[in-house]
């Protein structure tokens, strides 16, 4: 998509800024007609080089002539007139000063980019504000619902107290009247009738009050159910989905404390309702009557309250931290046999009476059908302490939790020789950890169970990359925790999904994810030149099939580069010095108009173990197309001996017997090499202690340094005029430094 096309999609307030960039000296018509051609030229270079500016000026006039011809074929007289007028104006204004035209065009394109960036930031801010506002409004709404439940419980508490007072008064008056009727003198009939009418009235008030209390409890349970459904079916589900994303490198998951607060308030409210129902039963036992609303509704109210509390407490039992080996904290859900792993459980209902009352047991592959239905499906035993009591003391935030820190898996070995004829390879075989406990209170027994996300069990660390690929693919595409047959028929992933997850793999271990250009290159590798966000990528294409003409799959190549960055290139990657994922064609397109000695850093596409190289541009001696030179890629072996910044600093090329020189001058687009990498150069080491080598005049070891030297034919260099012939002594010294490796076969020398 051209920059000019993107600008035309902006809101009117940004389009107005674009209009202000252009006037008669360089009209907008030319920008419109020659949009793509203008954007492909290096106007910054032209603005600083009169000869280059002159060439671009005449090229632009030629482009206008071509456009005029197209309008002629279309018989568009008005546009022909405009083109001729624009061309004459350009010739009048810039024929003698082409640099001025280049400066204007460069400035306009630069300002356009700023307008696009400002518009993008504005849209992101608007989107972020809208999203934040929506989330905040949703949180406020839930807060209001939870408070409403709590307030209604308190209201019912007061209503039951009023009911109890009314019933006590009614009972007292009934007994008083009965006692007076049994007295010797009796009660006057008129007085007796009056008191009976009063009791009748009180009875009706009592009946209405009981009906009112029962109705309010029913209403409370209705509101509680709606609130609880929002917590369980919306908030908790969203948290679990965010946890899946966080497990595979996505944004960190939100804290559970707010969710715990809501769950706890609702649970406390339901516990209070249970106490209120007990109170109503006590009142019923003291006094009941035909069609008593308490007698009629109490069982339904008990059952419904228990059902809501059971659903809430069972849903609140979650895996707060998924199974993970401490040795690989950024690769959760991949477990190696014989290596300890940790997992943390949490109860979102934080009631003091539950502290130290819930004993959690961990089980492996409980009720997993695949154990019997999938041929070759492995079975494992759990070693270590597999029971733990939940408490509030071990957690830093005081939550009710249980953390298993010393669990291990051991494979059950079947008698006979194990075959690998099953439909799933080891790293596609999904397993699960289940956790059980039981809540016991007077008149209340509830079984709790939760399950981890699927895990991959490996027996060798070399299986870790493939195992992690399975975890990525599953959690990117599935929200179900128990779909362990997923890889029998794994679905395809859309490039829009996979590209985001690939970027997470870099941003989760570095300070920088993948930008659009880098992702476009990877998309073309997987989908070809017509890659689109909706392009479908099969699982086998991502992880199992050799990519293009290479002898390794796409994911293992990415994983190797990740390891190379983490161990050897992290500061350079974080600073944005490494372009990394760029095709050779795109690389040459970027470098061809740059000044000699401009270079960029990219990852090798042909190295299975991950490698990085640099390519620089030189002007050809015959004035034709520029020459490009790429050094043999550096792997972890070379980078373990010498840091990459030092390699760039000391790199030399040698032609025949001339003095070696460093061809690397500017990091693309125009950053001085020492400015880009200087802070990473190794500092000089202290001189070694003198040693007696040849008597009293011995001065110790002679310091050596590892450098990279490439021999090239003189014709491949920009020029050899400035490479002075070396004396025999100088040549011998260089040969000594380089070593005995033959120059014609040498690329990197130790």
From Swiss-Prot:
It comes from the Eukaryota. Changing residue 673 to R: In IMD31A; impairs tyrosine phosphorylation; results in impaired STAT1-mediated cellular response to IFN-gamma and interleukin-27. The modification ADP-ribosyl glutamic acid is found at residues 657, 705. PROSITE patterns: SH2 (PS50001). Changing residue 745 to A: No effect on transcriptional activation of ARID5A. Residues 573-670 form the SH2 domain. The modification Phosphothreonine is found at residue 749. GO terms for biological process: blood circulation; cell surface receptor signaling pathway via JAK-STAT; cell surface receptor signaling pathway via STAT; cellular response to insulin stimulus; cellular response to interferon-beta; cellular response to type II interferon; defense response; defense response to virus. Residues 136-317 form a coiled coil. There is a cross-link at residue 703 (Glycyl lysine isopeptide (Lys-Gly) (interchain with G-Cter in SUMO2)). Changing residue 366 to A: No effect on IFN-alpha-induced STAT1 phosphorylation and nuclear translocation. Changing residue 710 to A: No effect on transcriptional activation of ARID5A. Changing residue 704 to A: No effect on transcriptional activation of ARID5A. Pfam families: SH2, STAT1_TAZ2bind, STAT_alpha, STAT_bind, STAT_int, STAT_linker. Changing residue 727 to D: No change in enhancement of MAPK-induced sumoylation. Basal interaction with PIAS1. Interaction with PIAS1 increased on MAPK stimulation. The modification N6-methyllysine is found at residues 114, 175, 296, 366, 525, 637, 665. InterPro entries: p53-like_TF_DNA-bd_sf, SH2, SH2_dom_sf, STAT, STAT1_C_sf, STAT1_SH2, STAT1_TAZ2-bd_C, STAT_linker. Changing residue 724 to A: Impaired phosphorylation at S-727. It is found in: Cytoplasm; Nucleus. Changing residue 657 to Q: Loss of ADP-ribosylation and increased Tyr-701 phosphorylation. Isoform alpha homodimerizes upon IFN-gamma induced phosphorylation. Heterodimer with STAT2 upon IFN-alpha/beta induced phosphorylation. The heterodimer STAT1:STAT2 forms the interferon-stimulated gene factor 3 complex (ISGF3) with IRF9. Interacts (phosphorylated at Ser-727) with PIAS1; the interaction results in release of STAT1 from its target gene. Interacts with IFNAR1; the interaction requires the phosphorylation of IFNAR1 at 'Tyr-466'. Interacts with IFNAR2. Found in a complex with NMI and CREBBP/CBP. Interacts with NMI which is required for CREBBP/CBP recruitment to the complex. (Microbial infection) Interacts with Sendai virus C', C, Y1 and Y2 proteins, preventing activation of ISRE and GAS promoter. Belongs to the transcription factor STAT family. This is Signal transducer and activator of transcription 1-alpha/beta.
